[in-house]
């Protein structure tokens, strides 16, 4: 009875161990591949719990999401014979799920060592061997990342389709201490040169600013002077216009005054001409004789009145004609002057 219990206990333990080894879990973002007797099985499994034959079947979980492989301490010899070391090179990649079986079959589950690590060493050594230390360390360093990515992806497209390189990051290489100090000194001098150049640019900028300020100030003064000059010109033109208006008004007044005087003289002349009749002249003669205080005696006194009446009348008529002619000519001359 005791032996039976021992057998049952051993059988139960074996069953539990078999069950425990048969059940396995695949994490999200991974694909499970299976080996039986060392041979890779064609079947794969996704995330979750799965069963397999215990003891004779084993599995490996292959990541299909983005992962970063680090390649450390990669030696590299330049074309000048200087040995440098890259401390760390990071390769970001991912595996397409449907390509897991083919890649694991051809390159094992540790495919990254064969496809990525070895390729990084090879490409870096080829790059360094055709470039100088100056080019690798400074001039072409920014191109190493992209060149490595393109070279890796080109080979993987033909050798392992489904393995995609997302990015490559390369750290600054370690160079011999003496050379590094020279580069640091060179960078220091270059920095000083850049600082001096920037100071010169600042001085030039300040001078340019001062020049622009002076130019703006001169333009402002010129504009003010131009405006002032324009105001003075306008004032002079206004004064000239006012003077012309006053002169025109004065000339009009004088002309009107002269016309009035001429008209008055003409009317007086016409009135005088109308008065110079023989009867009026005879009357004026009698008044003149009557007002004369001297008295003449003699026999010719009556004849004097008779004979002289005609002569005096003719004289007064001639005088009136001359006066009328002169008065008529004066308006014409005044009109011609106007």
From Swiss-Prot:
The chain crosses the membrane at residues 4-24. Keywords: Acetylation, Cholesterol metabolism, Endoplasmic reticulum, Glycoprotein, Lipid metabolism, Membrane, Signal-anchor, Steroid metabolism, Sterol metabolism, Transmembrane, Transmembrane helix. This is Erlin-2. It is a single-pass type II membrane protein. Signal peptide: none annotated. Forms a heteromeric complex with ERLIN1. In complex with ERLIN1, interacts with RNF170. Interacts with activated ITPR1, independently of the degree of ITPR1 polyubiquitination. Interacts with SCAP, INSIG1, SREBF1 and SREBF2 under cholesterol sufficiency conditions; indicative for an association with the SCAP-SREBP-INSIG complex. Probably part of an AMFR/gp78 and INSIG1-containing ubiquitin ligase complex involved in ERAD of HMGCR. Interacts with TMUB1; TMUB1 bridges the association with AMFR. Interacts with SYVN1 and RNF139. Interacts with TMEM259. Interacts with TMEM41B. The modification N6-acetyllysine is found at residue 267. GO terms for molecular function: cholesterol binding; ubiquitin protein ligase binding. The keyword Membrane applies. It is found in: Endoplasmic reticulum membrane. CDD domains: SPFH_like_u3.
